[in-house]
From Swiss-Prot:
GO biological process, one term: rRNA catabolic process
Keywords annotated in UniProt: Nucleotidyltransferase, RNA-binding, rRNA processing, Transferase, tRNA processing, tRNA-binding
Source taxon at top rank: Bacteria
Listed name of the protein: Ribonuclease PH
Entry's EC annotation: 2.7.7.56
InterPro entries: ExoRNase_PH_dom1, ExoRNase_PH_dom2, ExoRNase_PH_dom2_sf, PNPase/RNase_PH_dom_sf, Ribosomal_Su5_D2-typ_SF, RNase_PH, RNase_PH_bac-type, RNase_PH_CS
Task of the protein: Phosphorolytic 3'-5' exoribonuclease that plays an important role in tRNA 3'-end maturation. Removes nucleotide residues following the 3'-CCA terminus of tRNAs; can also add nucleotides to the ends of RNA molecules by using nucleoside diphosphates as substrates, but this may not be physiologically important. Probably plays a role in initiation of 16S rRNA degradation (leading to ribosome degradation) during starvation.
Length: 237
């Protein structure tokens, strides 16, 4: 039995609140159970130097956790003068995931930056960030269309992500922190609406996992991501 009483395949209750803040072109609060992430999408004219004159846009992301998002306070990375390796890894993952779903030529020479700020962490912050950021990105693109900044919708398809793992010998989906800290295997999987993979991150924390167990986790993730994309679309309807 999982601590929450959920079945192995069951994800936590997911809530997506759009237009959460006033100023951002796309703003979403996403909640996976007790994990809460604010995803703000900001639109700017112009692109990084390496893209200037190419007629393409750019989508990038930044990720951070508020000092008291966890059980004990963590110092702000700004106070240490640099970002940690985990932060850099996660924000690169978010950026890669979002760029996959955008036609950069249709975006034109505009940059969209997604800021993912973890308000409260209870496992799965990077996957919640990707899932919420995609909805914020869609709202930002719709704003651009309304402003006449793009002629056609640059969105190719939705993207979502989920964590899966092996807990007490059983594959489970959408791990809470207490589960993640005890899991023998932990995976983060990002997929497109069409069912294609963007990223599979898998690590054996305790006991090594078999090929069959890996396939079980991937199949479980596919099912959960289909469910998440349905939730995204309902929020955008």
């Amino acid at each position: 039995m999982r601590p929450s009483g959920r079945t192995a395949q069951q994800i936590r209750p997911v809530t997506i609140t759009r237009n959460f803040t006033k100023h951002a072109e796309g703003s979403v609060l996403i909640e996976f159970g007790e994990t809460k992430v604010l995803c703000n999408a900001s639109v700017e004219r112009g692109v990084p130097r390496f893209l200037k004159g190419k007629g393409q846009g750019w989508v990038t992301a930044e990720y951070s956790m508020l000092p008291r998002a966890t059980h004990t306070r963590s110092a702000r990375e700004a106070s240490r003068g640099k970002q940690g390796g985990r932060t850099l890894e996660i924000q690169r993952l978010i950026g890669r995931s979002l760029r996959t779903c955008i036609d950069m030529s249709a975006l034109g020479e505009h940059t969209i930056t997604i800021d993912c700020d973890v308000i409260q962490a209870d496992g799965g912050t990077r996957t919640a960030s990707i899932t919420g950021a995609c909805v914020a990105l869609v709202d930002a693109l719709n704003w651009m269309r309304a402003q006449g900044m793009v002629k056609v919708n640059p969105l190719k398809e939705m993207v979502a992500a989920i964590s899966v793992g092996i807990l007490d010998g059983e594959p489970v989906s959408d791990l809470e922190y207490i589960e993640d800290s005890k899991a023998d295997t932990d995976m983060n999987i990002v997929m497109t609406e069409a069912g294609k993979f963007i990223e599979i991150q898998g690590t054996a924390e305790g006991e090594a996992f078999s090929f069959d167990e890996m396939n079980s986790l991937v199949e479980m993730a596919r099912h959960s991501i289909r469910e998440l994309i349905d939730i995204q679309k309902q929020a955008l309807a």
